[in-house]
Structure formats: C-alpha cells, structure tokens
C-alpha cells in the first residue's frame, strides 16, 4: 500500500467529530472482568474483524443463541476517525493498526516492509480504502476447483454477494448513469455501497483514453460484473450518510443484545479438552502482564483473527508443523505443516507523472468541518480520484506462463490516488530517491499492482509468546515472473499517459525517472520501490475434505479437529484480481449459513 500523504492532528479530528453519534445493537465490554458470569455462550468468535462480525451477526438471528466476540483492538465507537471516508489514508500506522513489519526481503535488497493489519472492531473493513471489488468470475471458479467446493463458484456466490449488498444513490444524489450496471448490484443487504465520485478534469481525460487506446484500456460500465479487465468507475463501501460502511457499522449495529463484544482483549490460544482434538475453549488476556482467562463455547469456536493472527493463534495452540512448534517449545497437538504457509499477497509500486492538471489538494481542517456539518465535501469521498484500471497483459508478455485465474482476469491494477504538490513522506521505507519537490510542479500519483504474485510467503512464530509479533515473510519477487509482470504494468501505465488525451497536460514521468526504461533498470527500480498492497490471504488455506495439504475443509472446520472453524481471509487459497474485502464478506456469509445449518 502506499504513501500516507494525509497527516492529521488527532486533537483536530476529535474536536471535529464530537457530534458523531454511533449506535450499536450488541453489548460491548471493555475488560474481561466486566463480562457477565451468568451467560453461557453458544458460539465464541475469536476476532472481531470483517469476517468475525458477519458470522456473529448472522448467528445472532437465532435469538436463542448467545454469541461472544473477542477483539484485540478498540471499539469502532471509540475511534470516530474510522467513520470518515476521507481519513482512510491516515489509519495505517495509527492506533487502529497492528503495525507489523515483514522480515527482510531477499529480492528487495534486504528491505523490510510495513505490513498494515487492522486492530479495531470491524477489522480491515473499518481500516481499509473501502474499495468494493468482487474479484473475477475466474477467481471464484478457481477457488471452487482448488477447494473442491462448487458452492464457491461464481454462479453460486453471486446471489450471496447481491444479498449482502445495499447499493444506493450516494449522499450527494450524483447521477450514476454510465458509472454502474444496476443489474449487477443488490439493494436490500446490510453492506452499503455507492459509486460516488469527485468532479475533476482527470475523469474526462481518462475516459478519452479508453477511446484512443481502446485495445489496451477499454471502458467497462461496471467493474463488478465478473470480467474486470478494463477502466471503470470505482465503487466504495460508504453509506448514504457519507460514512464508512464496515462489518461493525453494517452488521454488528443491527444485532440484538444476544451478541456480547469484548474489546481491547487478546486471544492467546485455543484450548483443547484434555489435550485432544476437541477445541471449544479460548484463552484470552488484556496484555502480557494480565491474568489469562478461559471460556468454553457450548457449540463452536470460530477463529477470525485474520491472515496473520489466525495462524499465530493456531500455532501457539499446538496446531502446526511439528518441527516448527518443537523449535519454539510448543507441544504439537495436530501436526499440519500447512499452517502459516501459502501467504498470497499483491506487490505494488508508486508511479508519478509531472503534470499541469489541477491539483486535488484541500484543507483538511476545513474539509472535516464541512463533512461534520453537512456530510459533503472531499471528506465524504473514498478517494480524490475516481477510477480503477485493470490490464490484462498479452500472451507474449507472460513468458509462456499465465498466473491469472483465467482469460477474463487482469494481471495489473492501476489505482489513481491524487494530483498533488505533496510527495510521500520521508519515513516511507523506500530506497529510491524521490524527486525534489522544488523541481517539479503538480504530480499525478498512482499505484501499479501485480494482482497475481506466484511466490508464496509465510507466517512463522519467533517464540511461544502469544503477544510477540510473528515473522512475516512475503517472499516478494521470490519468482522472477512476479517482477516481470509488474515491470510490464509500469510500461502499460506509461503508454496510458502518452496517449493523445494527456499530451498537453503530462510533462513526463518523474518516478521512476524517464530514462529508466530497460528491463534491468526497471527491475532495479522495482526492487527498491515495491511495497505490499496489504491484500494478504491464504495462510490457513481451504482445501478439499481429504486433501493432504491445506488447513480447513470446505465447511471451514480445521482439519483433524472438532468444535473449531476458521472464517477470515486466511482461508482464501489465493489473492483475487482485486481487493479482498468483498471475498472476505462473501466467504463469511457462506460460512455463517453452514454453521447455522449444523444445528438445525
């Protein structure tokens, strides 16, 4: 992910948002000692992120069931800045972030990368860029094939996605004619989606490019129709009141009081009955200096701690590769070397072009005040620019091997960010020399993303301290094909901004410099500029029922156990052609049906 250009004064934010009213149907507890002693929970959800709150909400529809959610971070009610769409770029690295760092990456010259994961109720849906992309039809069919579960095919999940979605006219009543295909969307679900946009001249120039370079950059009416390999208007999880729509606001706040939420509390282990394979108990504590407590679910324990923390919890509980667990002094209860492996993410780089286009900068304090008073202005939008571009590379650029899920899937994404006088801050871990701000004018900045990295990473424990961060290895560019595809993405972007539409407003590329053109020079640039796009999945991958690999079965049960399921991004076998929040919502909706059906 990329530069945090918005720098905020926390006192300013708190003052501006004093009037923000937040409802919550569930009962929230701030400390383990506050939990009622007379409630026996049918289900315990370990992790109150995107998936965990979907599961809790759906299970709560049975009023006879009591559900407990345990979340390490604060409540979204205590972090009002997460409600404001325009503050999304300020959240990574903040109090709502785990602030992970990867181990040094060999192919990046030993650089370690920031790896943002949300630590707040609602998880990454409370913390992300709110982009709503479903992935490609090919992705879902691939997942169905690799897991042996046709319930994950595109035709099977599309009704689930529509049922969960509440697409609506946005807060400013902008016309969306020509921006979306209404037939693709649902309107009666819980998760709010809009196609809001800012009126900037850059919009018209991009659309003109889709006519001038239509072979490479055709226009797509709706990026969520299952075949996303064109330029399209972005859609966001924002509600009609210009507030972020997350699993905390859309799902949790609609539940009854049969859902209890314990925040600021870490899940340290899941506990088996008599060192067997029946896992229904969870151990938790506020911090490393606090006493640990254990609660047992009457029916099931659902682990939803995310792509990093879920494998960490399993390994600390004795579920993982025997040799790795023995090395850190953890007794092995279930020997499964797939735990923590298969980390699948997306590699990205930032591109900058010197331009005479009007800039998109604004006064943050004034914009916050406007949003607070009227839910309008730049803070009401998910981004300063309004389009995503998906590029499918021609076969002759793939060196005989196509890493995508199919012919209707793109290899590359362009996410346009801003046109600004501001450059990324100096504290971004980036070894490439940024241009001197005094030597250039306004700069168009956007990300170029390799959607399908084929070199898998891993999450491994340093020791058996559940409060210590694990070792995260993205293995970025571990395969030369990954850097080759991102290199072609950079060249594709340069072709876009060499089109006639941009001839009079683009003065040239400044990052990387214009003379960086050869394979060797572009690769050197990428090795010193690439970052993770923070779309990690796969560390507890789903696989067929009797497969010798993978961690969970298609019913989300952890292989070799009873009473324990995993529902979060970690079970998705591979990153999609797009952003990950919609697949996580969809997997969670599917899992909720399976869990509830087990008790009917």
From Swiss-Prot:
<feature type="glycosylation site" description="N-linked (GlcNAc...) asparagine">
    <location>
        <position position="546"/>
    </location>
</feature>
<dbReference type="GO" id="GO:0033718">
    <property type="term" value="F:pyranose dehydrogenase (acceptor) activity"/>
</dbReference>
<dbReference type="InterPro" id="IPR007867">
    <property type="entry name" value="GMC_OxRtase_C"/>
</dbReference>
<feature type="glycosylation site" description="N-linked (GlcNAc...) asparagine">
    <location>
        <position position="507"/>
    </location>
</feature>
<comment type="similarity">
    <text>Belongs to the GMC oxidoreductase family.</text>
</comment>
<feature type="glycosylation site" description="N-linked (GlcNAc...) asparagine">
    <location>
        <position position="99"/>
    </location>
</feature>
<comment type="function">
    <text>Catalyzes the single-oxidation or sequential double oxidation reaction of carbohydrates primarily at carbon-2 and/or carbon-3 with the concomitant reduction of the flavin. Accepts only a narrow range of electron acceptors such as substituted benzoquinones and complexed metal ions and reacts extremely slowly with O(2) as acceptor.</text>
</comment>
<feature type="active site" description="Proton acceptor">
    <location>
        <position position="535"/>
    </location>
</feature>
<keyword id="KW-0285">Flavoprotein</keyword>
<keyword id="KW-0732">Signal</keyword>
<feature type="glycosylation site" description="N-linked (GlcNAc...) asparagine">
    <location>
        <position position="342"/>
    </location>
</feature>
<dbReference type="Pfam" id="PF00732">
    <property type="entry name" value="GMC_oxred_N"/>
</dbReference>
<feature type="glycosylation site" description="N-linked (GlcNAc...) asparagine">
    <location>
        <position position="114"/>
    </location>
</feature>
<feature type="active site">
    <location>
        <position position="579"/>
    </location>
</feature>
<keyword id="KW-0964">Secreted</keyword>
<keyword id="KW-0274">FAD</keyword>
<keyword id="KW-0119">Carbohydrate metabolism</keyword>
<feature type="glycosylation site" description="N-linked (GlcNAc...) asparagine">
    <location>
        <position position="399"/>
    </location>
</feature>
<feature type="modified residue" description="Tele-8alpha-FAD histidine">
    <location>
        <position position="127"/>
    </location>
</feature>
<keyword id="KW-0325">Glycoprotein</keyword>
<dbReference type="GO" id="GO:0050660">
    <property type="term" value="F:flavin adenine dinucleotide binding"/>
</dbReference>
<feature type="glycosylation site" description="N-linked (GlcNAc...) asparagine">
    <location>
        <position position="199"/>
    </location>
</feature>
<dbReference type="Pfam" id="PF05199">
    <property type="entry name" value="GMC_oxred_C"/>
</dbReference>
<feature type="signal peptide">
    <location>
        <begin position="1"/>
        <end position="25"/>
    </location>
</feature>
<comment type="subunit">
    <text>Monomer.</text>
</comment>
<dbReference type="InterPro" id="IPR012132">
    <property type="entry name" value="GMC_OxRdtase"/>
</dbReference>
<feature type="glycosylation site" description="N-linked (GlcNAc...) asparagine">
    <location>
        <position position="275"/>
    </location>
</feature>
<dbReference type="InterPro" id="IPR000172">
    <property type="entry name" value="GMC_OxRdtase_N"/>
</dbReference>
<dbReference type="GO" id="GO:0005576">
    <property type="term" value="C:extracellular region"/>
</dbReference>
<protein>
    <recommendedName>
        <fullName>Pyranose dehydrogenase</fullName>
        <ecNumber>1.1.99.29</ecNumber>
    </recommendedName>
</protein>
<keyword id="KW-0560">Oxidoreductase</keyword>
<dbReference type="InterPro" id="IPR036188">
    <property type="entry name" value="FAD/NAD-bd_sf"/>
</dbReference>
